[in-house]
């Protein structure tokens, strides 16, 4: 027997075009916490599929990605360097309930960002 098999889900996770994401792209330049995606309502959390942050300044900057006030990823970005995170289906970064995605910068240096995410019920 020959033919194609269409896999549309893995467990409860819908694959492909079944998932709708929102795209956020802008620049953060304030030292300290910069909210890049607002917190969803109670009983919901953000699910990050892809994230890119680029240091657009000439100054090395420590970057901390947070779920609300909790640091989840930390690193130093050299001048004009970027980080890129892309998560496989089912392995996306799930933030805490009703918590914003926050980009903390060690200095007032311009950083561009692009984020693809969705909101999911707890």
Feature locations, PLM:
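Beta-strand-centric surfaces of beta-sandwich/beta-rich domains
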Residues: 1-122
